[in-house]
C-alpha cells in the first residue's frame, strides 16, 4: 500500500473538503463580528465574550470528537462518515447563525449564543475527522506531501472565493435589506460547501487501518501526550498560527497607516493569497529534492530573516512591500502542507512506539492548539495596539503606535518563524531515513515497544 499512487481526482476530492471548511471559516472570521454588531444589533462586548467562550468549549469538544472518531466503525471507515453526515446540519446552522429573527434584546443574545455555539460544535464534527482523514488515505510520505499540497491550494482558493463573493451576494440578494442579504449569501455559500464535502466523501478512501485497541479514552489521552514528537508539532502549530494571525490582524492597520491607504488592503491581501497558492504547489517538488524537515526549518529561518528585513523597509516603498508580502506568502504556505504531513508522521510514530494508532485524537489536539494560537494572536494585536495609544479617529498616529504596527506585522512573526526553525531542527527527529526504517517495521508488524520502547532511545543514526 505504500507504493499506491493517489489519483489527481482523489487529491482534488480531499482538497475540496478543506476548501469547504475555509468557505465557512474565513467568512466567519471576516464578516461575523460585523454581522452581529451592525446587522443583528448586539453589543460588541457580548460578541467578544461569546467568541472567547467558544474557544473554551473547544478544549472539551475537540478531543472528544477525536476520541469518538477513533472509535467509529462503519463500512465507510472511521472519518469519512462524519464529513458527509455532518455536512447538512453544518450548512443549516450556518444559515441560522447568519439569520436575524425579530426578537427582544435578550432573545437576540440567547439566539446568537445558541446558534454560534452549534456552529462551533458542528465545525468540529466535520473538520476534525476531515483533518484526520489525510493521515489514513495513504502512508506513503511522498504521496502525503502531494495530498496536503493539493489540499492547501484548494483551501486558499475556497477562502478567497468566500471572502470575495460574500458582499456581492449580500447586495444582490438583499439589496437594502442587509439582514436578508447576509442570510441569503451564506445560504448560497453553504450549499457550495456541502457539495464540496460530499465530493470529498465520494472520491476519497481510507487505506491505513489502525490495529485493534480496547483502551479507555483516558489511556488514549495519556498515550498521545507521551508522544514527544506530537508535542513538538503542537508547539510548531501554535507558532505557525501566531505568525499568520498577528500579521493578518495587523495587515489592515499596516496598509492604512504605514502604506497610507486602506484601499490597498484588498490588493495586499490578494497578493499574499496568490503567494499562498504558489507556496502550496511548491511543497511537493521541494520535498522530493530535500528531506521535508530540512525544507521546513530552512524555510522558517528564511521567513524570519525576510520578516526582520521588512521592518526596515521605508514607509513610502510601496512596491517593495508588495514584493515582500508576496514572497512571505509563498514561503509561509510552503511549510504548511509539510507541517500537516509531520503530524501524520507523529501518528505513525505513536503506533510504532506503543501499537496504538490514535489518528483522530492526534489531529484534534493539533487543531485545538492552533485555536489557542489564533486566540493568543488576536489578544496580542489588541494588547499592543492599546499600549501604543492607537486612536482610530485620528488622522495620523504617533510614532510609538506606528512602530508597534510595523513590529506586529514583521518582528513578532519573525520571532515565531525563528523559534519554529530552531525547534524543528533541534527536537523534531522524524526525518526521512528514520521514517523509512520505522515504516518498514510497521509494515512487518514490528513495534519499538516489543523491545522495551520506554527505555530505549531512538537510534541516533536514523535521526540525521
Name each model-derived stretch.
Residues 2-464:
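Membrane-embedded alpha-helical bundles of multi-pass transporters/translocases
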Amino acid at each position: 500500500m505504500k507504493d499506491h499512487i493517489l489519483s489527481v481526482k482523489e487529491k482534488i476530492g480531499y482538497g475540496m473538503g478543506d476548501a469547504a471548511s475555509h468557505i465557512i471559516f474565513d467568512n466567519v472570521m471576516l464578516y461575523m463580528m460585523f454581522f452581529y454588531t451592525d446587522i443583528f444589533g448586539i453589543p460588541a462586548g457580548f460578541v467578544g465574550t461569546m467568541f472567547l467562550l467558544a474557544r473554551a468549549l473547544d478544549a472539551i469538544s475537540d478531543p472528544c470528537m477525536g476520541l469518538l472518531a477513533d472509535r467509529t466503525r462503519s463500512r465507510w471507515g472511521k472519518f469519512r462518515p462524519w464529513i458527509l453526515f455532518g455536512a447538512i446540519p453544518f450548512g443549516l446552522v450556518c444559515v441560522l447563525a447568519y439569520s436575524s429573527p425579530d426578537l427582544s434584546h435578550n432573545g437576540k443574545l440567547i439566539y446568537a449564543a445558541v446558534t454560534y455555539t452549534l456552529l462551533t460544535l458542528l465545525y468540529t464534527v466535520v473538520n476534525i475527522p476531515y483533518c484526520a482523514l489525510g493521515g489514513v488515505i495513504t502512508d506513503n510520505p511522498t504521496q502525503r506531501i502531494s495530498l496536503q499540497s493539493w489540499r492547501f491550494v484548494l483551501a486558499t482558493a475556497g477562502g478567497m472565493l468566500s471572502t470575495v463573493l460574500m458582499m456581492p451576494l449580500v447586495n444582490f440578494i438583499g439589496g437594502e435589506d442587509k439582514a436578508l442579504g447576509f442570510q441569503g449569501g451564506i445560504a448560497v455559500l453553504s450549499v457550495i460547501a456541502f457539495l464540496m464535502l460530499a465530493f470529498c466523501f465520494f472520491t476519497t478512501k481510507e487505506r491505513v487501518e489502525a490495529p485493534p485497541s480496547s483502551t479507555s479514552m483516558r489511556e488514549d489521552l495519556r498515550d498521545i501526550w507521551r508522544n514527544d514528537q506530537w508535542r513538538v508539532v503542537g508547539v510548531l502549530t501554535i507558532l505557525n498560527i501566531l505568525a499568520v494571525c498577528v500579521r493578518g490582524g495587523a495587515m489592515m492597520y499596516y496598509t492604512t497607516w504605514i502604506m497610507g491607504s486602506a484601499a490597498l488592503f484588498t490588493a495586499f491581501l490578494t497578493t499574499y493569497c496568490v503567494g499562498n497558492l504558489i507556496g502550496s504547489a511548491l511543497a511537493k517538488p521541494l520535498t522530493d529534492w530535500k528531506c521535508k524537515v530540512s525544507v521546513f526549518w530552512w524555510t522558517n529561518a528564511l521567513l524570519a530573516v525576510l520578516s526582520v528585513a521588512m521592518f526596515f523597509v521605508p514607509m513610502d516603498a510601496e512596491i517593495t512591500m508588495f514584493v515582500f508580502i508576496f514572497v512571505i506568502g509563498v514561503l509561509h504556505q510552503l511549510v504548511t502542507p509539510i507541517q500537516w504531513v509531520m503530524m501524520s508522521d507523529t501518528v505513525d510514530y505513536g503506533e510504532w512506539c506503543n501499537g496504538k494508532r490514535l489518528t483522530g485524537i492526534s489531529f484534534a489536539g493539533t487543531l485545538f492548539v492552533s485555536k489557542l494560537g489564533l486566540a493568543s494572536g488576536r489578544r496580542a494585536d489588541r494588547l499592543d495596539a492599546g499600549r501604543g495609544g492607537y486612536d482610530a479617529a485620528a488622522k495620523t498616529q504617533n510614532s510609538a503606535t506606528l512602530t508597534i504596527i510595523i513590529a506586529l506585522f514583521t518582528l513578532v512573526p519573525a520571532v515565531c518563524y525563528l523559534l519554529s526553525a530552531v525547534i524543528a531542527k533541534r527536537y523534531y527527529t522524524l526525518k526521512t531515513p528514520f521514517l523509512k526504517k520505522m515504516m518498514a517495521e510497521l509494515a512487518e508488524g514490528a513495534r519499538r515497544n516489543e523491545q522495551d520502547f520506554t527505555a530505549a532511545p531512538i537510534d541516533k543514526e536514523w535521526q540525521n
